[in-house]
Amino acid sequence: MDIAQAKEILKEDLPFHAIVDFADQVVQEMNLSKNGKILDVGTGEGNMAITLALNGYRVITGEPEDDYSDYSKKDWAGKANKLHVDQLITFKPFNAENMPFENGMFDTIFLFCCLHHMQEAVRADVMKECIRTTTRAGIICFFEPTKAALELIRKAAPDHPDAADPVLYTQGFNLSEERRNSDLFIAYIFKKRD
């Protein structure tokens, strides 16, 4: 199934429509190996994991087991099932600041609009864990909302936190950085350097 078909099936799902084209564009530009190991931190509504699965990637995704926020209660599995990509997505509960994965396990890690929901005190630890669990040539990709996106979000959720800048947590690590921008999101793509 392609992105256009998925959008038609999920035509009532406004968050999916808001992110899928840009997320898909970024994934396409990254030219990831179809056999690569991919982690999606912060499942939420499942939009990032589903976008990856629609592109044929197998994905591990997860949230903290003790997360009772509105985002963690979303039926991402039902959405993935509707799109027939549920078999490509494995859910595993975990905390991003202390991941239960081996060193160098993942080729690519995605964090779609979740860093700004994490406490400031753990964000540096989250970055360290992403670096620890990616391969030597690993890629870590954060998506964060723009001011325009926050204005839209805050119409329904006035207390929604400000976007986070993942660059602040890269100090001391040998990473290259690229950015991709859309009206609603910024993708920060960090690549490990030897």
Which residues fall in each region the model found?
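Conserved class I S-adenosyl-L-methionine
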Residues: 35-44
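Conserved alpha-helix/loop element of class I SAM-dependent methyltransferases that forms part
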Residues: 16-35
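Conserved beta-strand signature within the Rossmann-like core of class I S-adenosyl-L-methionine
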Residues: 137-144
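A short glycine-rich, Lys/Arg-flanked "PGG" loop and its adjoining helix->strand segment in the class I
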Residues: 124-136
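A short acidic, Gly/Pro-enriched loop at the edge of an enzyme's catalytic core
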Residues: 97-109
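Class I SAM-dependent methyltransferase Rossmann-like catalytic core
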Residues: 2-21
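Class I SAM-dependent methyltransferase SAM/SAH-binding core
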Residues: 47, 51-98
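Conserved Class I S-adenosyl-L-methionine
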Residues: 152-175
